[in-house]
UniProtKB/Swiss-Prot annotation:
Residue ranges annotated for the HTH luxR-type domain, each copy included: 146-211
Organism whose genome encodes this protein: Escherichia coli (strain K12)
InterPro entries to which the protein is assigned, alphabetical: Sig_transdc_resp-reg_C-effctor, Tscrpt_reg_LuxR_C, WalR-like, WH-like_DNA-bd_sf
Lineage, top ranks: Bacteria, Pseudomonadati, Pseudomonadota, Gammaproteobacteria, Enterobacterales
Protein name, UniProt field: Transcriptional activator protein BglJ
Transcription among keywords: yes
The gene coding this protein: bglJ
Keywords: Activator, DNA-binding, Transcription, Transcription regulation
């Protein structure tokens, strides 16, 4: 039994919803040979405490719809990328739009971005592929397209998103950037078009990710390889 336990790879799941955790546990049991030992945590604090005792091959963050918790999750993933570069990092997003934004604007490369809106079969397949480092060609192409789109954001557009993430209104952003309100609104709608979002909520998701991206870039300078 000890030998069998050692062979299993430890995977951490940070998920507040108990029912979701039970559902994901059942998917892990369906893997051929069940090569993983899943550890579930309801908070980042309990997960970080466990990291001092357990070596994880992969970490799965299930993002909440709450902005504050999503930002904390992104920051934790960024920190993991710096401190534990060999650990696989996966995200479970609330829907396809959030999954697309996270996949394209993530401050560091992710091994998988899954959507709760996916069918059970697709979710299970993507979970398996993400844990094993395999990517479907179509997924790579789609992700590359969104990455290319995000790179077309101008410095002004990125600043607008960062101000939005901090709670500034369009009028306040115009004052900060010394631009008229019509110009700021035009930039805003241009960003929405580039990122494929149709609401301020979608823009805020992108803004939160970009804010973490700036933190990641700073951390990489302070803590290079």
């Amino acid at each position: 039994m000890e030998h069998s336990r050692i062979k299993k790879r430890n995977v951490a799941l940070i998920e507040k919803c108990v029912m979701s955790s039970i559902g994901i546990e059942s998917l892990f049991r369906k893997f051929a040979g069940n090569p993983y030992k899943l550890h579930t945590y309801t908070s980042q604090e309990s997960f970080q405490d466990a990291m001092s005792r357990i070596s994880f091959a992969a970490v799965i963050f299930s993002f909440s719809a709450m902005r504050s918790e999503r930002r904390e999750g992104l920051s934790c993933l960024t920190e993991l990328a710096i401190k534990f570069p060999r650990t696989r990092r996966l995200v479970i997003a609330d829907d396809d739009i959030e999954a697309r934004l996270i996949g394209s604007l993530s401050p560091s490369p992710l091994d998988g971005v899954l959507s709760k809106a996916s069918t059970l079969e697709i979710f299970h397949q993507e979970l398996f592929l993400s844990l094993n480092g395999v990517r479907q060609a179509t997924d790579r192409l789609n992700n590359q397209w969104y990455i290319n789109q995000s790179r077309t954001l101008s410095p002004t557009e990125r600043e607008i998103l960062r101000f939005m993430s901090r709670g500034y209104s369009m009028t306040q952003i115009a004052e900060q950037l010394k631009r008229n309100i019509k110009t700021i609104r035009a930039h805003k709608f241009n960003v929405m078009s580039k990122l494929g979002v149709s609401s301020d909520a979608g823009l805020l998701e992108a803004a939160d990710i970009l804010l973490c991206m700036r933190h990641c870039e700073t951390s990489n300078v302070l803590h290079p390889y």
